[in-house]
Design a protein with these regions (language model features):
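Function-dense linear segments that define catalytic or interfacial modules
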Residues: 129-131
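N-terminal assembly/attachment segments of tailed bacteriophage virion structural proteins
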Residues: 1-110, 118, 122, 126, ...
Length: 170
């Protein structure tokens, strides 16, 4: 099987009655999904497999569905986010002098591609510098106590710094 889609996340609006939502990407096991509910105040809650929802379609290249259990159906003010969350492990073990295991080898390649896609989705949500940027300091070396109640800024050389508060803005 190939991984021909780059989709790793689906989002839907709840309505208080709909309990079934599609995910449109392959997973190998039910536990390879993360289901998050985002409410009207932007609070995110990760739901628990079998407690809050069940999964169908593991192993299907086109995805499947999640079904919320009774009492856990998303309301009209909630957003359902379904993300692939494959384990970041490698479980294939080749045995010396055995015939080449094409199926398990391809599964390993698929799992690697899934991990790459998950990482790319996270990178796509991060703050980035352009490819031609010449900024040298992209790390913060001061600890959390020294960063507390401060803002990101730029020094006279255009380098990233953590600076004092600006007026009454926090």
């Amino acid at each position: 099987m190939t991984i021909s889609s780059t989709t790793v996340k689906n989002s839907y609006s709840g309505n208080g009655t709909l309990d079934t939502f599609n995910y449109t990407f392959k997973i190998f096991a039910d536990a390879d999904l993360q289901v998050i509910i985002r409410d009207a105040t932007a609070t995110e809650t990760v739901k628990t497999l079998t407690t809050h929802y069940t999964v169908t379609g593991a192993g299907n290249a086109n995805g499947g569905t999640i079904v919320f259990t009774a009492g856990n159906i998303p309301t009209a003010t909630e957003t359902v986010v379904i993300r692939r969350a494959s384990p970041q492990t490698q479980a294939i073990d080749y045995i010396a002098n055995d015939p080449f295991p094409a199926e398990s080898h391809e599964e390993g390649l698929d799992r690697s591609m899934m991990a790459i896609q998950q990482l790319q989705e996270e990178v796509n949500r991060s703050i980035k510098l352009s490819r031609t940027n010449t900024m040298n300091s992209t790390e913060f070396t001061i600890g959390d106590t020294d960063r507390a109640n401060k803002v990101f800024g730029f020094d006279s050389a255009g380098e990233l710094v953590v600076t004092q508060e600006l007026g009454t803005f926090r």
